[in-house]
């Protein structure tokens, strides 16, 4: 059995995560080139907030106030922002509504210069190793550099906590839908106030 991970402990590259959170905001649907629907939701627990990318019809069932358990999730960087995803064989299970203590700060999905610098170093190292291996016999190309776990670098100075006073409903629904185990460009990278900037294709 996987132990629960708090939002503050989520780092890029972690896999098989089990996270319990409340949905604060649901983002607009974005369509990928291959027809998938992607929605970014802002979620929180008592340690802070993070974005989760939800694929296809599962996003239609998620509403603000839902308390959800993510199982077999993973964390990755999307445009320099830490984001949760449902892994292969993982799911999102609604276990309640409204009554959960959460903190809106710190937001661990805000762009982090430490992560951005690490991604740049990884890309540079990959480019250098790619040119160096061209002179040697190599049976396969170098794999992409993984996101390294180097801490979140966020400063949480006295997070505020909120607790909703609405009664809890004894609803328990299961939202199951595995998504591809990869992140695609085009998903919004943050949810701020429910209004997201329009995204366009690669330029």
UniProtKB/Swiss-Prot annotation:
Its main location: nucleus. Residues 115-128, 159-182 have a biased composition (Polar residues). Residues 129-140 have a biased composition (Low complexity). Residues 110-203 are annotated as: Disordered. InterPro entries: NA-bd_OB-fold (IPR012340), SOSS-B (IPR051231), Ssb-like_OB (IPR048970). One of its GO terms (cellular component) is SOSS complex. One of its GO terms (molecular function) is single-stranded DNA binding. Belongs to the SOSS-B family. SOSS-B1 subfamily. Component of the SOSS complex, a multiprotein complex that functions downstream of the MRN complex to promote DNA repair and G2/M checkpoint. In the SOSS complex, acts as a sensor of single-stranded DNA that binds to single-stranded DNA. The SOSS complex associates with DNA lesions and influences diverse endpoints in the cellular DNA damage response including cell-cycle checkpoint activation, recombinational repair and maintenance of genomic stability. Required for efficient homologous recombination-dependent repair of double-strand breaks (DSBs). Component of the SOSS complex, composed of soss-b (soss-b1/nabp2 or soss-b2/nabp1), soss-a/ints3 and soss-c/inip. SOSS complexes containing soss-b1/nabp2 are more abundant than complexes containing soss-b2/nabp1. This is SOSS complex subunit B1-B. It comes from Xenopus laevis. The gene is nabp2-b.
């Amino acid at each position: 059995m996987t132990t629960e991970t708090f939002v503050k402990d989520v780092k890029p590259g972690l896999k098989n995560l089990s996270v319990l959170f409340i949905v604060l905001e649901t983002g607009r649907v974005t369509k990928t080139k291959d027809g998938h629907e992607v929605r970014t939701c802002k979620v929180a627990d008592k340690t802070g907030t993070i974005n989760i990318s939800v694929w296809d019809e599962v996003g239609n069932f998620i509403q603000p106030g839902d308390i959800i358990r993510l199982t077999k999730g993973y964390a990755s960087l999307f445009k320099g922002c830490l984001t949760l995803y449902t892994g292969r064989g993982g799911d999102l299970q609604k276990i309640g509504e409204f009554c959960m203590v959460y903190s809106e700060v710190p937001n661990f999905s805000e762009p982090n210069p430490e992560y951005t610098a690490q991604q740049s170093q990884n890309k540079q190292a990959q480019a250098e190793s790619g040119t160096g291996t061209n002179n040697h016999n190599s049976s396969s190309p170098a794999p992409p550099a993984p996101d390294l776990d180097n801490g979140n670098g966020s400063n949480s100075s006295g997070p505020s906590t909120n607790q909703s006073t609405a009664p809890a409903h004894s609803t328990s629904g299961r939202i199951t839908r595995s998504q591809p185990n990869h992140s695609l460009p085009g998903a919004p990278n943050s949810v701020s106030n429910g209004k997201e900037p329009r995204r366009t294709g690669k330029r």
